[in-house]
Amino acid sequence: VLSRRQRQMCIRDRYILMDGPLKNLLVVDLTRVLVGPYCTMILSDLGARVIKIEAPEIGDDSRKFGPFIKDYSAYFMSLNRGKESISLNLKNSDDKKIFDKILSKADILVENFKPGTLEKWGYGWKDICKKYPKLIYASASGFGQTGPLKELPAYDMVVQGMGGLMSVTGQPNSEPTRVGTSIGDITAGL
């Protein structure tokens, strides 16, 4: 049983989610871990309907990140609040039909796969803009879509080190120190 205050909070939160400034937008979320889910969480918080697409059996890597509450990752739940979710294998023709139906109604697609992955499945920028010309296509990758490092995976700590940020944190005469939060992912997610 919820207290009066808890009921008021639920009503307030539901109102905010339903009537935010992005309430008429549909976002397709093909993201995982932090940068993409953070971006789409903000869009959801602002009222957009967000449908998160996850690979069968694997899902978002962050489902395995602790701490856990009743077997669910608190990290995953916090970044994916307010979103709908469906499991689709984008290599499977039946699942592609479902995905295409979702895309046909969508306003925005957000993805953070390694460059070239969606192209292999027929959903790269060139394919999408021909089939869905009004769709906004947002892509985040650690080292960009072009250039010599595009194939490398990027985690925030690696980018902090490569960018020199770790050399100016921590104590004098100590090892390079990671900033306490994943500042690169969070900033890019904005």
Set out the residue ranges of the language-model regions.
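Single conserved hydrophobic/aromatic residue that forms the stacking wall/gate
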Residues: 1-13
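N-terminal helix-loop segment corresponding to the beta1-alpha1 unit
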Residues: 15-190
